Amino acid sequence: MSTVISLPKINGEYRKNFKLSQLTWFKVGGISQVFYKPKDEEDLSCFLKNLQFDIQITVLGAGSNLLIRDNGIDGVTIKLGRSFNEINFVKNNHYNIISVGAGTLNYDVAKFCLQHNLGGLEFLVGIPGTIGGGIAMNAGAYGQEFKDVVYSVEALDRLGNKHIFLSKDLNFEYRQCIVNGFLIFTKTNLICYNDSKTSISQKLQKIQTVRKLTQPINQKTAGSAFRNTNNYKAWQLIDKVGLRGHSIGGAQVSNLHCNFLINNGNATASDIENLGELIRKNVFDHTGITLEWEIKIVGKKSL
């Protein structure tokens, strides 16, 4: 049974029993007990300071790399609004740096850099999602990861206090950053360099072409389902056990890239999670290797 929540007064927006499937790339998932979109960082800080401490908080980015279970999410689900989408130049004696709000789409950062002749962040065009989500999981593609370009990060803790971390403080590892306690990233400074518009454009086009040829980008999918292992790509192991194209309910392993799970139109979150767990079991039974989810799974499990 869900806990009754006493909500602080805020300047942002609350919605109760909000349908979360509309915000995820899989287009599945239940409702949020309370959905909150803060007006700005001050509003978010005030909310955190005044929300009873035992209430669960879940933060959403763009809804990629995410599976929300059918029974939904208790507590408060937070999605950063437009005030967290700003991109600005930062003065620095040693680097070219841009300040980016955590709610900004990775694609929009890549586009901004193209417009301003800034190189080094082209890989972001190949990573669906927001900057905040990318930092939280040290997202990467095409030979780069967030740890390679993050200079510093601003965040709020569970009590609404603001912290600034240098990249080294975030303990970046493969597909994760390790920090103590609950944090909501609000802004980051990213390192880039001067480059020609032609060079940047060519790199962006190459990445986008590769994505279109190798990933099911026009289907309902959340990106790579599993982390690669030390010795094998996840797709190689899935292919090895013969699960390319395999289905459970409306969920299917992509024929194009078998580390992508897709919703064929009528899948439930349970279909997708069960298909993923079947993959993990089969890979372990045949190879002794445990695949770890790269997709973040949140929400209440079915009884």
Curated annotation (Swiss-Prot):
Keyword Cell cycle: yes
Cellular compartments per GO CC: cytosol
Location of this chain's protein in the cell: Cytoplasm
Disulfide bonds: none
Oxidoreductase recorded as keyword: yes
Record's keyword terms, sorted: Cell cycle, Cell division, Cell shape, Cell wall biogenesis/degradation, Cytoplasm, FAD, Flavoprotein, NADP, Oxidoreductase, Peptidoglycan synthesis
EC number of the protein: 1.3.1.98
Pathway the protein takes part in: Cell wall biogenesis; peptidoglycan biosynthesis
Catalytic activity as recorded in UniProt: UDP-N-acetyl-alpha-D-muramate + NADP(+) = UDP-N-acetyl-3-O-(1-carboxyvinyl)-alpha-D-glucosamine + NADPH + H(+)
Domain of life: Bacteria
GO annotation terms (biological process): cell division; cell wall organization; peptidoglycan biosynthetic process; regulation of cell shape
FAD-binding PCMH-type domain: residues covered: 27-207
Main subcellular location: cytoplasm
InterPro entries found in the cross-reference section: FAD-bd_PCMH, FAD-bd_PCMH-like_sf, FAD-bd_PCMH_sub1, FAD-bd_PCMH_sub2, MurB, MurB_C, MurB_C_sf, Oxid_FAD_bind_N
Residues annotated as the enzyme's active site: R175, S224, E294
Pfam families recorded: FAD_binding_4, MurB_C
GO molecular function per UniProt: FAD binding; UDP-N-acetylmuramate dehydrogenase activity
Function summary: Cell wall formation.
Family recorded in the similarity comment: Belongs to the MurB family.
HAMAP family listed in its UniProt record: MurB
Name of the molecule in the record: UDP-N-acetylenolpyruvoylglucosamine reductase
Organism: Orientia tsutsugamushi (strain Boryong) (Rickettsia tsutsugamushi)
Gene name for this UniProt entry: murB
